[in-house]
């Protein structure tokens, strides 16, 4: 049994894969397994993985014949993992050589800890920028969940095996599955701590979260999936209220995305995106939202009339544009 299993979903990553794998094989904590799931890559990624696996038995390669996306790929790796703890590393990212050891030390010294965060450096070309979080030693699960809703704390960590098996990656939310599982891991952790190991997170302007495409509206679908999972867990009304406010703000945020970028999207994408916004708007439980928020222009639900709601949003974002205030936050 490995101490830590590292899940690496791989799709056409030949450009970055060597750096990623070398950083994992160089870990000062030797008892790890590296489970690389090749998600039907069309480049030389599989050949690279097989070559590394021949040199080091800690690397296990799973090859998927069809491209299934990162959530299903990671879950395929999770199912065959043996580690006491589970981490993920994207195939274009890498770890400091002591990252796993630092995380394991925290688990060893604090047995109530279920999740240990890495330090994160966002990599822009040759420039590294620290992800700044509020200073903390320990967070309870609820606080970590709440802080993750606005990403005051990030979602890059090592988690106890039992918790990850209970909450695998959300396969219903293709583009944002990691956000949902992160929040479920935090919410169900007894203690969340941080270590000094570093995760280097390469930033790409062409990623789903940066480009203008229909996939951006998937965020609302992921939010709906998250709400359903919270309800299935019978969480408190306090948690549901907090998350419903997040969902509502994201509905407004995605309408702003629609407002700003509709000239860049084809007609079919616009119709589909607007339909997703409408379904989310219809499903909002207004009674869970803060009264001051639903009285604020731009955020009034107008549940009885989609037309009136749209008129409000068009006016709201037109006025914001005149004032230079339309800045995307998703």
Regions found by a protein language model. Name each.
Residues 2-7, 25-36, 44, 56-60:
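Short loop->beta transition adjacent to catalytic acidic/histidine clusters or analogous donor-positioning motifs
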Residues 12-26:
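Short, well-formed alpha-helical segments that are part of the catalytic scaffolds
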Residues 23, 38-48, 66, 90:
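A conserved acidic beta->alpha catalytic loop
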Residues 64-81, 88:
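Glycine-rich, basic loop-to-helix element that forms the pyrophosphate-binding segment
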Residues 96-168:
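Flexible acidic/His/Gly-enriched loops in nucleotide-sugar-dependent glycosyltransferase catalytic domains
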Residues 141-219:
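Conserved nucleotide-sugar donor-binding catalytic segment
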Residues 197-204, 211-238, 250-284:
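Catalytic core of nucleotide-sugar-dependent glycosyltransferases
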Residues 263-330:
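Membrane-interface aromatic/basic loop that binds lipid-linked glycans or pyrophosphate carriers
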């Amino acid at each position: 049994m490995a101490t830590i299993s590292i899940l690496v979903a791989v799709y056409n990553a030949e450009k970055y894969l060597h750096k990623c794998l070398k950083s994992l094989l160089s870990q000062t904590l030797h008892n790890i397994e590296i489970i690389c799931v090749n998600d039907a890559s069309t480049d030389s990624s599989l050949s690279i993985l097989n070559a590394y696996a021949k040199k080091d038995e800690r690397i296990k390669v799973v090859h998927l014949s069809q491209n299934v996306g990162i959530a299903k790929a990671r879950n395929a790796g999770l199912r065959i993992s043996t580690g006491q703890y589970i981490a993920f590393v994207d195939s274009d990212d890498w770890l400091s050589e002591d990252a796993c050891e630092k995380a394991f030390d925290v688990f060893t010294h604090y047995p109530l800890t279920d999740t240990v965060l890495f330090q994160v450096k966002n990599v822009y070309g040759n420039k590294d920028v620290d992800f700044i979080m509020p200073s903390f030693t320990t967070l309870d699960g609820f606080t970590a969940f709440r802080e993750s809703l606005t990403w005051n704390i990030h979602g890059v960590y090592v988690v106890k095996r039992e918790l990850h098996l209970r909450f695998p990656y959300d396969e219903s939310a293709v583009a944002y599955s990691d956000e949902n599982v992160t929040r479920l891991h935090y919410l169900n952790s007894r203690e969340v701590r941080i270590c000094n190991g570093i995760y280097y997170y390469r930033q790409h302007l062409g990623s789903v979260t940066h480009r203008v495409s229909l996939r951006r509206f998937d965020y609302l679908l992921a939010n709906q999936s998250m709400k359903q999972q919270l309800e299935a867990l019978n969480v408190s009304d306090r948690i549901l209220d907090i998350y419903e406010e997040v969902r509502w703000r994201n509905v407004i945020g995605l309408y702003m995305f629609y407002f700003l970028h509709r000239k860049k999207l084809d007609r079919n994408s616009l119709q589909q995106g607007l339909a997703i916004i409408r379904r989310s708007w219809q499903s909002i439980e207004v009674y869970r939202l803060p009264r001051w928020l639903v009285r604020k222009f731009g955020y009034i639900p107008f549940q009885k009339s989609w037309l009136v709601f749209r008129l409000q949003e068009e006016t709201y974002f037109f006025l914001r544009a005149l004032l230079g205030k339309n800045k995307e936050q998703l």
